[in-house]
Design a protein with these regions (language model features):
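Basic, polar low-complexity surface loops/patches
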Residues: 1-100
Length: 100
């Protein structure tokens, strides 16, 4: 998994950016508020909980980067996409609904 501390720092103060990371399995994932924002922007995401070290869980969305709305992309590289998004309330309610 990508550097967890970096992800958590970004998501703690996330005010309208969506961070998507390519992981070792070759798949792309968004976490926490980025996953929430992305779920508001795109339908059909695979959402779930990522359990880390058996104690900490993070909301995670698997992303097909070929379906991203290109007009929202701020930057991208081989391992990361950053998109702009106008945030909405409801993250904590959405988080409570994610199944294990």
């Amino acid at each position: 998994m990508c550097e967890v501390v970096t992800i958590l720092e970004r998501e703690l103060n996330n005010a309208g950016l969506i961070y998507i990371y390519q992981e070792g399995d070759g798949k792309w994932y968004a976490y926490e508020q980025s996953a929430f924002y992305l779920s508001q922007m795109m339908s059909g995401l695979s959402l779930g909980r990522y359990i880390m070290d058996g104690t900490l869980w993070l909301a995670r969305a698997e992303v097909d980067v070929n379906l991203l709305p290109w007009e929202n992309i701020v930057s991208y590289s081989k391992t990361e996409y950053v998109l702009h998004y106008t945030p909405h309330n409801g993250f904590h309610e959405w988080l409570a609904e994610i199944k294990e």
